[in-house]
UniProtKB/Swiss-Prot annotation:
Residues 68-77 have a biased composition (Pro residues). PANTHER family: PRECURSOR OF CEP5. One of its GO terms (biological process) is negative regulation of developmental vegetative growth. The mature small signaling peptide is generated by proteolytic processing of the longer precursor. This is Precursor of CEP5. Mostly expressed in roots, and, at lower levels, in stems, leaves and flowers. Present in lateral root primordia (especially in vasculature and in the basal meristem). Predominantly expressed in the phloem pole-associated pericycle (PPP) cells, and, to a lower extent, in the adjacent phloem. Observed in lateral roots (especially in vasculature), root-hypocotyl junction, leaves, inflorescence stems and flowers. It comes from Arabidopsis thaliana (Mouse-ear cress). Residues 61-105 are annotated as: Disordered. Induction: Induced by gibberellic acid (GA) and phosphorus (P), but repressed by brassinosteroids (BR), salicylic acid (SA) and nitrogen (N). Repressed by auxin (e.g. IAA and NAA). Accumulates in roots in response to nitrate, nitrogen and ammonium chloride NH(4)Cl depletion. Induced in shoots by osmotic stress (e.g. mannitol).
């Protein structure tokens, strides 16, 4: 009887440790987000250019460096076509399901 209780206690301890260990692993499927470089628009500021120039052993004056202003952001497109990246939330109870599209507008 003693060995059965010892095995049961060991089994519960292993189960508890596995539960704690695997608690951090979550299987989550989600929509990947597109990362755009909207912080600096692809242009470097003068401090970054000075650091790059000093790194390359170039002598650059602040006054000699002329930067053009960044181009204006493009206007948002108003396309009516469907794309694979379109996202339209549905009301509860009216989900189209996998492989089906919303055709009843």
């Amino acid at each position: 009887m003693e060995s059965f209780m010892g095995q049961k206690k060991t089994l519960y301890a292993c189960y508890f440790l596995m539960l704690v260990f695997f608690l951090g692993f979550n299987c989550v499927h989600g929509r990947t987000l597109k990362v755009d470089d909207k912080i600096n628009g692809g242009h470097y500021d003068s401090k970054t250019m000075m650091a790059l120039a000093k790194h390359n052993d170039m002598m650059v004056d602040d006054k000699a460096m002329q930067f053009s202003p960044p181009p204006p952001p493009p206007p948002p497109s108003q396309s009516g076509g469907k794309d694979a990246e379109d996202f339209r939330p549905t009301t509860p109870g009216h989900s189209p399901g996998i492989g089906h599209s919303l055709s009843h507008n």
